[in-house]
Amino acid sequence: MDKATGFNLTIDAIRLPYTKDVATYCAPFSCEDNDLDEFFATDAFLYDSELLGRTYAWVNAADPTQILGLVTLANDSVKAQFITSSARNRLQRSISNSKRGINYPAVLIGRLGVSTAYRNKGLNIGSQIIDFIKDWFRSSDNKTGCRFIVVDAYNNERTLKFYTKNGFKPLYKTETEEREFLGLDANDALETRFMFFDLKLR
């Protein structure tokens, strides 16, 4: 819940699997990001049909034709044996030595968008969606083990600030370190930063 406005995503919105029927019933969704808008308009349904990603919609309980936010989730893992030693130490810092391994189960936030109509109103919809995901995968109802939430966050100030505010950390401390790991030249754009959240931490 947002303390300032009293908006509570679990009360003031309804979570639904994002299907073509939901998309048809609701008003067109836009978060003013062309790539995200196109994904949610078309690709989200293809990912779902191929079991590659599942998208969820939060619609306004007072007006169910209005989509507040969308998120696409997929299974993933952090392959510790393939990352640099400094990044591996950063990742494993809170894991006991006896439980450290070469792979750690994770859930990937593939896409996350908040409707332009509901942004910048103090509702904190994006952060409340993140909180829902954290609680969902910590819950005893979760059918598989999952240690981390991971995201390839757009490498811009607003997006990085959002995920940092919600407890995510960059796997690589610097862009230079991440660029070197990815084999990018100095002039190549680093379009995303890999960030993680440890579900064992509160």
Summary of predicted features, one role per range:
Residues 156:
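Negatively charged, flexible loop motifs adjacent to catalytic sites
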Residues 153:
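His/Cys-centered metal/cofactor-coordination and adjacent catalytic loops
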